[in-house]
A protein has these predicted regions:
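A short beta-strand-loop structural module common to alpha/beta enzyme folds
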Residues: 44-50
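Glycine-rich, mobile lid/loop segments that gate access to catalytic sites or pores
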Residues: 166-177
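Auxiliary tRNA-acceptor-end handling modules of aminoacyl-tRNA synthetases
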Residues: 1-24
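Acidic, His- and aromatic-enriched active-site or binding-groove loops in soluble protein domains
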Residues: 66-77, 183-207
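Positively charged, Gly/Ser-enriched RNA/tRNA-binding surfaces
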Residues: 2-4, 24-41, 52-53, 77, ...
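Short secondary-structure transition/capping segments
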Residues: 10, 57-61, 273-275
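Polyanion/phosphate-binding surface patch
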Residues: 50-81
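Short glycine/threonine-rich loop-to-helix capping motif typified by GTGT followed
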Residues: 176-186, 272-278
């Protein structure tokens, strides 16, 4: 039934925002800086629909997003559809679709709007825009370093100083080597990495209990290694993941980056990461949060599309 005398409210849907001209001007400026920097590094822009099939996210996206935060529905053809919660599976799908036609290494970027049904809070709404920068077809440590240097250039372009933020870096491959050294079963690696990523966000006792539930007595030794300054590198210095990450760090330090910090508790939440992971973290106590984040995902295209 249509019609009636009920007046409509002027508020936007909960968790999203309107952009009046003065606010749109600010967003446009931010986007223009992003574009100027990434294009100076040789990245080409792409885009895709906000609609994707549900199965694209089921296997590799963070379980919390899939189980609790997706905007999903069935269309009139009875297909399960989502509003994209992240862009990486989408760009992986696009590259897989024309893999033999795309010159490698391929440098692509996009500024997508993304949707997650989560509790709206400061700095986190149900719709947000982010800069996605991806390089395909390179196994060089320089590729890992390049993305971090690019993010660092963006911060400088906005006027940030080195002490305004720190660049935290780790490696999922290095952490997997650590789990193997501690004889933690391989099938536990993903859940352990998710728990470790929460270490600085939950009480110490809660963190310990979560680890003990998964790995028993190995939890105490794992915590001691994570808490020591160089414990992970000292234990695994001769391994391939440690040597690779050291090469990435060396490239970054030679590029005059001053605020790099090895952070073994940084693992990032997505299951598709296989190597280096990083975050640019705001050091201002009033805005203590990640600004940029990402990492290497070597197997995503093959895992999803064969």
């Amino acid at each position: 039934m249509f019609g009636g005398d009920k007046k409509l409210g002027t508020e936007s849907y909960k968790g999203v925002r309107d952009f009046y001209p003065e606010e749109q001007a600010v967003q446009n400026y931010i986007f223009s800086v992003w574009k100027k920097v990434v294009e100076s590094w040789g990245y080409a822009e792409y885009d895709a629909s906000i609609l994707e099939p549900l199965e694209l996210y089921k296997s590799k996206t963070n379980e919390e997003i899939v189980n609790e935060q997706l905007y999903s529905f069935k269309d009139k053809g009875d297909r399960e559809v989502v509003l994209r919660p992240e862009m990486t599976p989408t760009v992986a799908r696009m590259v897989a679709g024309k893999f033999n036609e795309i010159p490698m290494p391929a440098r692509w970027y996009s500024i997508p709007n993304l949707f997650r049904y989560e509790k709206p809070q400061r700095g986190r709404l149900r719709e947000h825009w982010q800069l996605n920068v991806d390089m395909f077809g390179s196994d060089s440590p320089y590729a890992d370093a390049e993305v971090i240097m690019l993010a660092n250039d963006i911060m400088k372009k906005f006027g940030a100083k080195p002490d305004d933020y720190e660049i935290r870096i780790n490696s999922r491959a290095l952490m997997n080597a650590l789990y193997k050294k501690l004889e933690i079963p391989e099938d536990k690696s993903k859940i352990i990495s998710r728990i470790i990523d929460k270490k600085d966000k939950i009480p110490a006792e809660t963190f310990k209990e979560a680890l003990e539930k998964e790995v028993g007595n190995a939890a105490e030794e794992l915590i001691a290694i994570l808490d020591s300054k160089d414990g992970v590198f000292e234990m695994l210095a001769s391994t391939a993941p440690a040597k690779y990450l050291s090469e990435v760090v060396d490239i970054l330090e030679k590029s005059s980056i001053q605020n790099l910090k090895f952070t073994p508790t940084l693992t990032r939440g997505f299951d598709y990461y296989t190597g280096m992971v990083f975050e640019l973290f705001d050091t201002n106590s009033e805005n203590s949060r990640s600004i940029f984040g990402g990492g290497r995902y070597d197997n995503l295209i093959n895992d999803l599309f064969g």
